[in-house]
Amino acid sequence: MKKVLVISKREFDKVMRDNKITAENIENRSKVAFISINDTFGTTETPFFKEDKENLRILFFDDVTEDTKLNWGTAKAFNKEQGKIVLEFLNKIKDRDTLIVHCHGLS
């Protein structure tokens, strides 16, 4: 992989729209891969994509070290299974030119 771009969700959504990348054609982007990191709570925004693709992984976790019960629900931590998913995905896409990663932090 030659380049990794880390951007906000807002910028990610804009890049997808500006480049006319959709769930139907994302796999045609043979030189690019994507990781979409989303919160599990506290947002009315939905992920740009709904399901994993050959070159896309969608993850849901919150900015906590361990699952944490709060007044409104449970914040979910990044876990070992998600770590394995990311590692397997990175191994699978290692020959792609670019990886674009976004997270849903406040932007």
Task: Go through each PLM region and give its residues.
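Glycine-rich, flexible N-terminal cofactor/catalytic loop recognition
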Residues: M1-L59
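Helix-loop module immediately N-terminal to the HCX5R catalytic loop
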Residues: N55-I100
